[in-house]
Structure formats: structure tokens, C-alpha cells
């Protein structure tokens, strides 16, 4: 039986009022003290990734971390940031308990704050 679950994300830039285009995201699987990079992607013009971050046989229960490269994104958008930036990286650690479910992790992002939730 094939798994139907998948992981997606969507990043909105709340400071500039638009999707976060070109934002680098790293996806890790956490196992004990080990952190394994699964893939690195960049958001498209809609602030989404072209296709799921994980799906099918590669989508498994466990603990994961998405790392959003906020500082690089805002600098490339022309936003003047302090040195060091308040939010250089935004790590979101979450669990996947059901390999047959859709896990959507939206991020609302500004240079000084962020919000996330399990979306649909």
C-alpha cells in the first residue's frame, strides 16, 4: 500500500506584504542527536515550493526541522537589517505522526517575528 501523505510549506512576507520569493529552506530529519539533511529548496514567486517537500515512500513518521534562511531573504529583498540580524535563521521543529496525512507548515515572516501553525 502506498503512502498518501506529504509535506508542504508556504511563506508570506508580512513586512513587505507579499509571498516570500526565493527564500532558502533546509529540511532535516532528526534521529536522536543526529540531524540529517533531506533536501534544500527555494520558494517560488507564490512563496511556495514547486511540489511537496516530501511525499510517497520518502514520507515517514518522525521528527523533522524546517530551517528558513530569513536573513538572506530579507537582505536580498533590500531590507536593511542590523548586524547581526535578529532572525538570521528560523528553525521549526515538528513531528509527523501519520504518514498518510498532509502536513502543511505555513510561515508568516518579518525581520523581527514569525508565526506558524499546522495548515491544511
From Swiss-Prot:
The keyword Transport does not apply. Substrate binds at residues 10, 48, 117. One of its GO terms (molecular function) is hydroxyisourate hydrolase activity. InterPro entries: Hydroxyisourate_hydrolase (IPR014306), Thyroxine_BS (IPR023418), Transthyretin/HIU_hydrolase_d (IPR023416), Transthyretin/HIU_hydrolase_sf (IPR036817), Transthyretin_CS (IPR023419). It holds the Pfam family Transthyretin. Its EC number is 3.5.2.17. Keywords: Hydrolase, Plasmid, Purine metabolism. Disulfide bonds: none annotated. One of its GO terms (biological process) is purine nucleobase metabolic process. It catalyses: 5-hydroxyisourate + H2O = 5-hydroxy-2-oxo-4-ureido-2,5-dihydro-1H-imidazole-5-carboxylate + H(+). SUPFAM superfamilies: Transthyretin (synonym: prealbumin). Gene3D superfamilies: Transthyretin/hydroxyisourate hydrolase domain. PROSITE patterns: TRANSTHYRETIN_1 (PS00768), TRANSTHYRETIN_2 (PS00769). Catalyzes the hydrolysis of 5-hydroxyisourate (HIU) to 2-oxo-4-hydroxy-4-carboxy-5-ureidoimidazoline (OHCU). Belongs to the transthyretin family. 5-hydroxyisourate hydrolase subfamily. Homotetramer. HIU hydrolysis also occurs spontaneously, but more slowly. This is 5-hydroxyisourate hydrolase 2. It comes from Rhizobium meliloti (strain 1021).
